From Swiss-Prot:
Homodimer. Heterotetramer of two MnmE and two MnmG subunits. It is an enzyme of class 3 (hydrolase). It comes from the Bacteria. Mg(2+) binds at S234, T255. The gene is mnmE. The keyword ATP-binding does not apply. Residues 220-387 form the TrmE-type G domain. It is found in: Cytoplasm. This is tRNA modification GTPase MnmE. Gene3D superfamilies: P-loop containing nucleotide triphosphate hydrolases (3.40.50.300), Probable tRNA modification gtpase trme, domain 1 (3.30.1360.120), tRNA modification GTPase MnmE domain 2 (1.20.120.430). It holds the Pfam family MnmE_helical. Keywords: Cytoplasm, GTP-binding, Hydrolase, Magnesium, Metal-binding, Nucleotide-binding, Potassium, tRNA processing. Exhibits a very high intrinsic GTPase hydrolysis rate. Involved in the addition of a carboxymethylaminomethyl (cmnm) group at the wobble position (U34) of certain tRNAs, forming tRNA-cmnm(5)s(2)U34. GTP binds at residues 230-235, 249-255, 274-277, 337-340.
Length: 465
């Protein structure tokens, strides 16, 4: 149990209203020392929980501000401790004055994520729910918001609890059998155990495979913009982002390194990657940039191959052997840029250049990035190419790398159990693998997580959370 009382500003600078959170055993008494209710009578410490009290913050006899104080009593608060929230005017001077008074009277400044860490340590939420708080704060689309809300409300935690219950049931049957091994008593039918192992494997496997979707939703669908130099890659990136992110020049090889940025299109976050133009060069730095281009191409889920319409035949012939083999299981959109410089009849001829491309994942479009023609249509194609499901708050989709790694290890363990059952190995070995699986599942919820891991998780939160 935490014996000290913490405080922190919970709102961003520049707003009309500011909020300071105070939590810990002395939260109410420390707040009472600097706060005087406007209505004479009840002191703050005598107020009922979940009440708002209007009054003034004093530094000695000087009034600092007129404020509202919210009161929460343990264990019915966010942290599970006695807590107050002081809502004042948003002046940075006022907020700092109130903070200094709280610290002078016994509070200490909260560490990043300490409020949520205390909520976890006090049993108000498990670790996966605590991590979802950070995801909710960082959410930038409807899908990321829904996934974070689902996890924070305990949807993922319930899935883990059910999974852990099945695993404990499994291992208890195995270990009970081991206790009576000398009496040759079989408590669990091996076919029934195999059926249970299959059920567990299906659940874990579904969660592991959901990470590809979850990671794309959370961090953005990776879209690599590739092509020869001066095909218009940087111009397209600037148009999509609606800002001059990349340098645009007629000089070949201007973009020498990878430029990344994200944008929300139709409720989906896309992570665009503008790459160095592909060409033969003796420039060492440019060569490194081209090498990174192919690395980013391999990592992308959608590839925008920018082709200069006035030189399309040559570019497609030169680069198709390098690009097409790398685009298997990706979505490839061939973007014929500078289409305003060619005749309508030429477009049919250029489209025919793609006749040997794999039709199942290849699309094409004619645009003019400079004139912003057909760029809206390109955005629609990106949405269709993303193939992301419509997400609801009831969906259980893994978005956290730590969870994915733990689930992957749990999946390996349950696979060993399945193989062991098929091979009729001893229950001792089966029990060991099952317990390993339980360990990794429990690690996600924070039931077996060490202090170093906790510190690493919560230090990425903002101070007031």
């Amino acid at each position: 149990m935490n014996q000290d009382t913490i405080c922190a500003i919970a709102t961003a600078q520049g707003g009309a209203i500011g909020s300071i959170r105070v939590s810990g055993p002395e939260a109410i008494s420390i707040t009472s020392r600097i706060f005087q209710p406007a209505k004479a009578g009840k002191l703050l410490s005598e107020q009922k929980p979940y009440t708002l009290t209007f009054g003034r913050i004093y530094n000695g006899e000087e009034v600092i501000d007129e404020v509202l104080v919210s009161l929460f009593r343990a264990p019915h608060s966010y942290t599970g401790e006695d807590s107050t929230e002081i809502t004042c005017h948003g002046s940075s001077y006022i907020l700092q004055q109130v903070m200094q008074l709280l610290i002078k009277n016994g509070c200490r400044m909260a560490q990043p994520g300490e409020y949520t860490q205390r909520a976890f340590l006090n049993g108000k939420m498990d670790l996966s729910q605590a991590e979802a708080v950070a995801d909710l704060i960082a959410s930038s689309s409807a899908a990321t918001h829904r996934l974070a809300m689902s996890q924070m409300r305990g949807g993922f935690s319930k899935e883990l609890t059910d999974l852990r219950s099945k695993l404990l049931n499994f291992t208890s049957m195995i270990e009970l059998e081991l206790d009576f091994s000398e009496e040759d008593v079989e408590f669990a039918d091996r076919s029934a155990l195999r059926k249970l192992a299959d059920e567990i494997e299906q659940v874990i496997s579904r969660l592991v495979h959901s990470f590809n979707v979850g990671n794309a939703i959370k961090n953005g669908v990776p879209v690599a913009i590739i092509g020869e130099t001066n095909a218009g890659k940087s111009t397209l990136l600037n148009v999509l982002l609606n800002e001059d992110k990349a340098i645009v020049s007629d000089i070949h090889g201007t973009t020498r390194d990878v430029i990344e940025d994200t944008i929300n299109i139709g409720g989906i976050t896309f992570r665009f990657i503008d790459t160095a133009g592909i060409r033969e060069t003796n420039d060492t730095i440019e060569s490194l940039g081209i090498e990174r281009t192919f690395q980013k191409l391999d990592q992308a889920e959608i590839v925008l191959w920018m082709v200069d319409s006035s030189d399309a035949s040559s570019q497609i012939k030169q680069l198709s052997e390098k690009i097409i083999p790398r685009c298997e299981e990706k979505q490839l959109i061939v973007v014929f840029n500078k289409a305003d410089l060619i005749e309508e009849m030429q477009k049919e001829e250029l489209s025919a250049l793609l006749k040997n491309f794999p039709k199942e994942y290849t699309k094409s479009i004619f645009i003019s990035a400079k004139e912003r023609r057909q760029t809206d249509e390109l955005q629609k194609m990106l949405i269709n190419a993303a193939h992301l499901p419509t997400v609801t708050q009831n969906d259980i989709i893994v978005t956290n790398v730590r969870h994915y790694e733990a689930l992957s290890k749990a999946l390996d363990a349950i696979h060993r159990v399945q193989d062991g059952l098929d091979s009729h190995i001893s229950g001792d070995f089966l029990s060991q693998d099952i317990r390993e699986c339980i360990f990794f599942i429990s690690d996600i919820a924070g039931e077996v997580t060490n202090d170093m891991v906790l510190q690493n998780i919560f230090q990425h939160f903002c101070i007031g959370k």
